[in-house]
Structures are given as structure tokens and as C-alpha cells.
Amino acid sequence: MINTDELTVDHFFDPSSKNFIDDPKPTIEKLVKEYPIARFNAWSAWLVTGNKNITDCLLDRRLSTDFNLWEHAPPKKELEDMDAFEKLMNNNLFFLNRSNHLRLRKLALPAFSPRIMEQMKVRFTKLVKERFDEIGKPERFNFATEIAEIIPTQAIASLVGIPRDKFPIFDSLAYGVVRGINPMLTPEERADAIAGVPAGLDLLNELIDEKRKNPSDDFLSTLITAEEDGEKLSNWEMCALIGAVLGAGSDTAGDWQSYLIRALLSHPDQLAELKK
């Protein structure tokens, strides 16, 4: 029997604290060196750090990201009893069993081809230029809120083919996807976070239905026409794939961009090299 009291990190790990937000490196280094696998009771979860440990966990067939496989998990709801957010998570790549995960990945792979990504590179560059034009030339501005929190979601919206005037609806969907799985939210906070998910899913389903009627050479049309062993993606599966892209590519990209700027400002020699 493992004594989890000796493996807990609650006494020093608080990802919401100002100290951690200002400089997470010392805490992360302590986790990696002293607590590579440890219990974090605040999340009712185990934390795994270090590339090898993480890789070993991901490859270990005894472990799964499917919460419903846990022996103490409550009975899974029937689809008709799920709310919009629960239906979205029901098909999310992050929580599927191995066989379904591989099936969806194989079907989705053509939509991420180099040809389509090259098309998107042009759109992404245009989005960034337009954003800087909107900001203008102030003496100072907040990169995190003005760029990092906006561009990644807009880039994914552009990838999916969301009309520019519908970006706010898609942004609310992205916010719900990222915030809705946060284990530290209260039920009230979670309900507020996912409030925009139904409208966002309605928008996606309308767009998917339109693309089914009038396909073109783009990301969403490629998802629709993808076929493997006679199977195609359903609307819910496509919505879940887009949700997975949002979960993996909006919040994380925003954090990465902010840390990149922080690192450059902390290393003037590297910033000078970049300016060359």
C-alpha cells in the first residue's frame, strides 16, 4: 500500500499563487527532481513530471485518459441526458480509449496535410498583421491580453472556416472548452465558463452542414470527406476534434507566446540577436 501522504505536493505546489505565476521554474524543478510522480489533493489527481515519466505513462496500456474506466467513476450518462459540453467531451480525443482515439486520428490526418497547412500559413500571417494594425503604435501594450489571448483562437477559427463576424461566438466556445475542464472551478464557475458552448456548437454544426452540401478544398471539407474502412466522421466527432484543437492549440499557444516574450526580455543578448 502506498502512503500518499508522503507523496503529496500540496504543501508547496499552488499553480494559482502569484509566486508560481511570476516564476514557475523553481517549483517545476522541485517537482521534477523530488516529486516526479506525486499526489495533488487539490485536484484529486496525480502529477507526473519529466519527459521519460510522462512518455512511459502515455505508452502504458494499464493507464487511460478515459475517466469512465475508473472503478469508482459514476455511471456514464446516456447521450440524450448530456448537456452540450458533456456531449462535446464525450468524443474528445483527450478522453477516448486507444482504439477510438486511433480511429479519429487516422480520419483527421488528411485535414492536417502540408498542403492545407501551407494555405493556412498565409491566413495566419494576415491575422497577425491585422491585429498589430488594430493595436497601432502605442508606447506600451499588454502582449498577453492583446496578442497571446487572441491570435491562437482566431487562427483556429480561420483554420475551421469561421466567418470573421462569427469569431466572438467561436471565442466563447474556445473559452468553454479550455476553462470547462479546469478541476479547480466551482460548479458555478464552470457553468459560467461553458455558457457559450451551445451557441458555438450550433455554429459549427451549421458550418459542417453547409460544407457537406458545398465542399471545397479546405480543412473542414477534408474532414467531412475523410473515410477509413467505410467509416466517416459524424458531426459530433468533428466538433470534438475541433474542440481538441482548441484545447491543445489555443490556451497552450497563448501561454507559450507569453513565456517566449518573457524569456526574450529576460535575455537581452538573445533579443538583440532576434532584432538582427
Task: Please identify what each model-predicted range represents.
Residues M1-K276:
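Cytochrome P450
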